[in-house]
């Protein structure tokens, strides 16, 4: 199959001006194949275009990349949402997962680069908050949220917002009708870890009549139903860790969950749960969960505002959040999420959004890729096999041109120098 066939297939799924069509489709096709590093030099060598064309496209047309991600995610959601099926063993039909990832940079010199605490140290780079939609076992990335540092906001005359404020604005303005059509808000569950345990986020979700399962910090204030009815609103709150320690009458229950891996292992959790109140939010189900064969350091406290859900459904539903971690692994390992060397943040933003476009396109059944191919790496290898003869045709065309032999020798020398 010729590369032009694949580029035509890509162009038909996007609304891009004809002037930018070739460079955008060439960059997307480059991201959709296997390569050691997704650099502009490699993109130019792969497509036959000049490096400056990709550089100008990334620097000057970030809005095109953003709008393309939004249109592709809506098309994919409409394609896979009919009919909507319940999530595995759960009462909800769709899940929205909120999680952040860090894009590493070598230094603080690029625009909007910042030090972020991560694990036992720090990471220099950019932070992206990802919002992904899970429907019918399909993960669909929505437009990511970039974090703007205070110096960058000052230089660009932008109002500074924290990461939590950005998430609140995003969820408040997210209209799922544009993605899946009419739906019942009670079928939506929002999943987030303790990094997004914020009353404003939880109230924004509740105001949209959605459900949430959020891992709360051990110092989050809660109150039992009995105390809520008999004490003033401002008193008798205690940390959730102390709450479960003081309510030892709540018995431990063991649940068994099958993993989603190839080996299908069984995990055992022991849980305690009760109804209570989350301060500044309202009535929720409180769950204390920990692996049965691990120490207390792995203990999690979950809050769910769906009163009809069982404790087992809450624990199993929260485990769906792991799919976004696998998504982060795929875009970093296969699609070159961190392979960016530009100093301007507009170029970084364009590259990230084109990476998301490539991820969506690989799951939209490109020509030559059979549906039984599931992994993102396998899909890339299949696309590369379909384009296998493209490099031979490019070399023969270059050698037949005037001065083509010398230009091809220079290209080989450059490739050997980069290796």
Give the residues covered by each predicted segment.
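Long, charge-rich low-complexity segments
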Residues: 72-83, 395-419
